[in-house]
Amino acid sequence: MASNRQRSLRGPSHPSHMEEPFLQMVQASESLPPSQTWAQREFFLPSESWEFPGFTRQAYHQLALKLPPCTDMKSKVRQRLIHPWKGGAQHTWGFHTWLDVCRLPATFPTQPDRPYDSNVWRWLTDSNAHRCPPTEHPIPPPSWMGQNSFLTFIHCYPTFVDMKRKKQVIFRTVKELKEVEKLKLRSEARAPPLDAQGNIQPPASFKKYRHISAGGRFEPQGLQLMPNPFPNNFARSWPCPNPLPHYQEKVLKLALLPSAPLSQDLIRDFQTLIKDRTALPLHHLSKAQASKSPARKRKRRPGHF
């Protein structure tokens, strides 16, 4: 009896046959792979490469997935985006002539030229332009739309079948025209249109802005802009020799800078050009009124002055 009690207290030296399956299950659960989500179990992982059966990917198929090589131009563009370019390109001397001519009224022949003389604008800078050969690419004659605008075309021609759609297009066009008038008024404040004598055509409500100094402050007797001299044929591509800030700089890009007056030589050549031609303004003056927003009256709180 004593020997049987000692055996029962010590326990069996080896596990019984009933406990072996339980131990195997515990050991198997320890070696199981980590738990996966439902998407990982049901769908293919994008990182794993797999191919359709019966199809072997060739080397040229990788060209569609391979990015194009980085060229020198692309690397320069990326560097400019990261580090902005400090030095800006200088405009040429002849660039001012192009700007000044664009401010003058457009000239139209009294009788249509056949063929159209494309050298007419060269007379402003070259007195012997009529002897020069015509331009390599023929310039079409100028067109004058007048009142024949897109809005008139919508009203006169039965373009739209749906009247509701037609009203929407007319409303959008009128809205765009009003916005154009506002932008035109801002442009006229900075660079007003000129007549054939080079004088400003001020509207009834035109306001002359004071000059702005280099620091961006208003000064009544500030920097006076001088007209740009006429370059000859050899100096048109040279950098502009005028050291004064006569052109819009980055610092004063949004400032109300007045335009430089025109050169007297350019006005004299233009008046000679329009003797047998009709001078019409580039565009009609803006009919938009400057917005006069009343100043907000601040209410004083009791105890504050």
UniProtKB/Swiss-Prot annotation:
Disulfide bonds: none annotated. Expressed in Testis. This is Testis-expressed protein 52. Residues 284-305 are annotated as: Disordered. The gene is TEX52. InterPro entries: DUF4532. Residues 294-305 have a biased composition (Basic residues). PANTHER family: TESTIS-EXPRESSED PROTEIN 52.
